[in-house]
């Protein structure tokens, strides 16, 4: 029944086979909305970013594999291979960028609107297998001596790489000789890492709850610890010193002997910083003198009678 889905199409009663297919009869295209610019030689395709780029409009990074609805246009030929240009809009801003195929170098070229993140390198530097160019292939086919030299060079490269490959094979066999123990060690290491990750997440959660923040904390690095230590020893900036001087002037009273209760505890600080004068202690000294004089003027009480005055009266 599945093969009938492509054949069982509805044909209206007024369908005329002389006008061609069903799409031509209805005045539509098989690609529907994707072919709205077909009269300009443009079709809409789903384009996948071949490498990492930066948008020139919003300066954001766009990773390899991000897909866009792109306008595909044929702009030329490289021998018998067509060259296509793709125009698409950035999903983060209103900027458009254009990318064109480069069949000669097996690559894509950015024409406008973006710049490429350079991650290209020479494959010969990391001993990758590089396909031969057309010139080398032609020379290998025509020149027997060059082919012999080429084979000798390949044999030498294989002999140089054989010890390294042998060490890799031996290490792989030693590690996975006992698959149960290797799996146990790997799982134990994973459990230890999971405990450390959960502990760090708990510390981060407590710190965020204490500071009432809703941000994602990155892992602590050595540079962060060094910067935190330098922040403790950092001197105050000119702006901070100016702010402290301005606050000190605002807290200073207008009169020399006045005390101000504003700015929190300024009156107490003023009292502590004021030097006591002699007149401030005069009241206490006066009270002490009055008490001493009154004590000396009072007559002591005696149990023996004083008859000196009566004797004088009688003698008189």
UniProtKB/Swiss-Prot annotation:
One of its GO terms (cellular component) is post-mRNA release spliceosomal complex. Keywords: Coiled coil. This is Coiled-coil domain-containing protein 130 homolog. Residues 182-203 form a coiled coil. GO terms for biological process: mRNA splicing, via spliceosome; RNA splicing. Residues 287-316 are annotated as: Disordered. Belongs to the CWC16 family.
């Amino acid at each position: 029944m599945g093969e009938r889905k492509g054949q069982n199409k509805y044909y209206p009663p007024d369908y005329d086979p002389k006008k061609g297919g069903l799409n031509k009869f209805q005045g539509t295209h098989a690609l529907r909305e994707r072919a709205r610019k077909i009269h300009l030689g443009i079709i809409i395709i789903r384009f996948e970013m071949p490498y990492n780029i930066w948008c020139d409009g919003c300066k954001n990074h766009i990773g390899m594999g991000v897909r866009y609805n792109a306008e595909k246009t044929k702009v030329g030929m490289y021998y018998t291979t067509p060259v296509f240009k793709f125009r698409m809009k950035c999903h983060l801003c209103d900027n458009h960028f254009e990318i064109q195929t480069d069949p000669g170098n097996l690559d894509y070229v950015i024409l406008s609107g973006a710049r490429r993140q350079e991650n290209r390198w020479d494959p010969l530097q990391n001993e990758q297998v590089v396909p031969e160019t057309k010139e080398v292939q032609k020379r290998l086919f025509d020149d027997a001596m060059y082919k012999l030299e080429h084979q000798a060079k390949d044999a030498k490269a294989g002999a140089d790489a054989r010890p390294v490959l042998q060490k890799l094979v031996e290490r792989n066999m030693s590690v996975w000789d006992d698959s149960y123990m290797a799996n146990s060690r790997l799982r134990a290491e994973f459990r230890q890492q999971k405990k450390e990750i959960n502990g760090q997440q708990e510390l981060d959660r407590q710190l965020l709850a204490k500071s009432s923040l809703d941000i994602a904390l990155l892992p602590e690095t050595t540079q962060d610890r060094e910067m935190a230590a330098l922040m403790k020893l950092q001197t105050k900036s000119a702006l901070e010193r100016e702010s402290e001087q301005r606050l000190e002037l605002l807290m200073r009273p207008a009169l020399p002997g006045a005390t101000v209760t504003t700015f929190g505890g300024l009156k107490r600080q003023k009292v502590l910083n004021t030097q006591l004068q002699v007149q401030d202690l005069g009241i206490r000294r006066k009270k002490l003198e009055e008490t001493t004089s009154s004590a000396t003027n009072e007559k002591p009480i005696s149990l023996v009678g004083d008859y000196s005055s009566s004797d004088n009266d009688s003698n008189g």
